[in-house]
Amino acid sequence: MRTGTENRPSRSGMGRQKRGKIMLELKDLCLSADAEGGKKDILDHISLTVEDKKFIVITGPNGGGKTTLAKTVMGLAQPTSGSIFYNGEDITSLSITERARRGISYGFQQPPRFKGMKVADLLQIAAGKKLSHDAACSYLTQVGLCARDYVGRDVDTSLSGGEVKRIEIATVLAKNAELMIFDEPEAGIDLWSFARLTETFQQLHDRLEHTIIIISHQERIIRLADEIVLVANGQIAGRGSVDELYPQILTETVRGCNMLEVDKKC
């Protein structure tokens, strides 16, 4: 199945552009956790800037610190040291709720379920306002769900992991946040829905209304990026455009670990 992105040139091939406003800045972030034999550095002096309205894909080997890095930005994990600046404001000590109010949203790799809550109600809570039936259905359609079959369902164990994942992504879209972070949005999603999802990410970026950070190993998502950030062993192992880093991702590994999942069916 084609997504309409296979023959599209990568954004990095469109020429260098003048650097824009810095939306997110991570300064010397460290995060340690208890491990056998002492402390383990999950994040090891990470510094990173993300420009406004850019599409960034963070990739790298499993266990390298990608999810922890994203959770630290959202406030789900607290750094041992270092600082996080969002639109020039130090948000290191702010709560998840305070960061959400400032315009940061997060799509979990393994979303929670909410027994007794309808999908339509969850979308309305995410949007922070009353949603029409058509608006709620639109968000579900964008993530490859048949809206009429899901809008009235409970967000409970009757839904598969892939269904809950897509509903979670729909809530992030409904929030319409300035900075959208998605942790492996492709996980547990079927091929057709994934194709629809990549189109949605492309459309979001084309509108130039949001900054998007996606953690992914998926080739088609990586190819959508303005910039790739490689994270391994808690450090930034590389950063650059798709043209600069994609050949390395295809042919090399970071310290012996494969970084990429290539969908050979498409």
Name what the model sees in each region.
Residues D90-S105, I249:
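ABC ATPase NBD coupling module
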Residues Q235-N258:
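Conserved beta-strand-loop-alpha-helix hinge in the C-terminal portion
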Residues G82-E89, A135:
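Conserved ABC transporter NBD signature motif
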Residues E184-P185:
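Walker B catalytic motif
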